[in-house]
């Protein structure tokens, strides 16, 4: 029995030593021994082979579309659709008339919203073209060959018996180092030395945590990286976005107060660096945050602020409405587009269904975390441009660069009801049509 304990202890020491030497130390200093690159190449080959085997099970060889949508929507504005609807009738149409047949337009939109609206599908996992040997996330897939099944079983053993313990070890070290290091740094008086230690702790921790997720990150256009005194805004998929960005540089964070593990991390970070955490439901907190952000931006020696203007996590298929508050405080905006590859794992965090711990466990049992980060050129508010227009301009640039769908809807609809202002806007548009105030609707006769 003693011999068994000795052997187990020796194996554990050897394993931990290899983890520290081959993974932990290189990641702390931002270098790599090439192990992750080899793993990703093997993984890509396996998934390509599995995809080909799966496709042989289909009689129809047509290319599948990776889309969550089942409705082909007409993107034309209300005025154009109603004009086409009226032109399809035989009676005379005069400008400003009310037509009972217009009800078909609203009925069509209503049925589309009932069957599949544009908002709620953004809060569920992205549909995949083919099964990635993780979960059956593709509705079009119904066949698995015996070979693919055996590969899936082998992959299951690798992910849960080898990768999961390794990743939990790295994540535990990274988070513990952040909490302990930030707490110790927080005891130092405010000085350049404290800022230097704080940046070092944050950077090393994020690099360790990124390695714990087998991250393969490509950063593009590094010459546009956010600079001190600026505001970095990015699309939001999960809290891992912070690790992805902070792996390449330090930021002062702004975000919603969380409980549990996330809350512990937030409180530790706030001790060493002037991060801003607030309660979204408290109006007083929101005004206080705005003032603190203005003070932060005015000091060019402070770290750039990282803000996610959507205010909630979206499934990385689209970019939803940017809240104008981030664009009212002044300063230079540094847009950043983040796009994850769902083939290797689903990075989306549905906070209304999954706790932070369960989400991290799911990520640690995925194949890897592969994503691209684009630093876009810095922008400033133009003369005569209000905060809403500025926010929409930045949102459009991020959506275009990341290949994401741009949506006007508020991400707050994830938890709340549609605001009356959205309904009133549609009512006003139709009122202009029947009042003859809309010039785009031309009178026609048949």
From Swiss-Prot:
Listed EC numbers: 2.3.1.15, 2.3.1.51
Membrane topology, as annotated: Multi-pass membrane protein
Subcellular location: Endoplasmic reticulum membrane
Molecular-function GO term, any one: 1-acylglycerol-3-phosphate O-acyltransferase activity
Top-level taxon of the source organism: Eukaryota
SMART domains: PlsC (SM00563)
Catalytic reaction list: sn-glycerol 3-phosphate + an acyl-CoA = a 1-acyl-sn-glycero-3-phosphate + CoA; a 1-acyl-sn-glycero-3-phosphate + an acyl-CoA = a 1,2-diacyl-sn-glycero-3-phosphate + CoA; dodecanoyl-CoA + sn-glycerol 3-phosphate = 1-dodecanoyl-sn-glycerol 3-phosphate + CoA; sn-glycerol 3-phosphate + hexadecanoyl-CoA = 1-hexadecanoyl-sn-glycero-3-phosphate + CoA
GO biological process, one term: triglyceride biosynthetic process
Pathway assigned to this chain's UniProt record: Glycerolipid metabolism; triacylglycerol biosynthesis; Phospholipid metabolism; CDP-diacylglycerol biosynthesis; CDP-diacylglycerol from sn-glycerol 3-phosphate: step 1/3
TM region(s), chain numbering: 11-31, 146-166, 168-188
Short motif HXXXXD motif, span: 236-241
Cellular component terms per the entry's GO annotation: endoplasmic reticulum; endoplasmic reticulum membrane
Entry keywords, A to Z: Acyltransferase, Endoplasmic reticulum, Lipid biosynthesis, Lipid metabolism, Membrane, Phospholipid biosynthesis, Phospholipid metabolism, Transferase, Transmembrane, Transmembrane helix
Function comment: Converts glycerol-3-phosphate to 1-acyl-sn-glycerol-3-phosphate (lysophosphatidic acid or LPA) by incorporating an acyl moiety at the sn-1 position of the glycerol backbone. Also converts LPA into 1,2-diacyl-sn-glycerol-3-phosphate (phosphatidic acid or PA) by incorporating an acyl moiety at the sn-2 position of the glycerol backbone. Protects cells against lipotoxicity.
Similarity remark: Belongs to the 1-acyl-sn-glycerol-3-phosphate acyltransferase family.
Record's comment describing the protein's domains: The HXXXXD motif is essential for acyltransferase activity and may constitute the binding site for the phosphate moiety of the glycerol-3-phosphate.
Name of the protein in its database record: Glycerol-3-phosphate acyltransferase 3
UniProt lineage: Eukaryota, Metazoa, Chordata, Craniata, Vertebrata
Gene label: gpat3
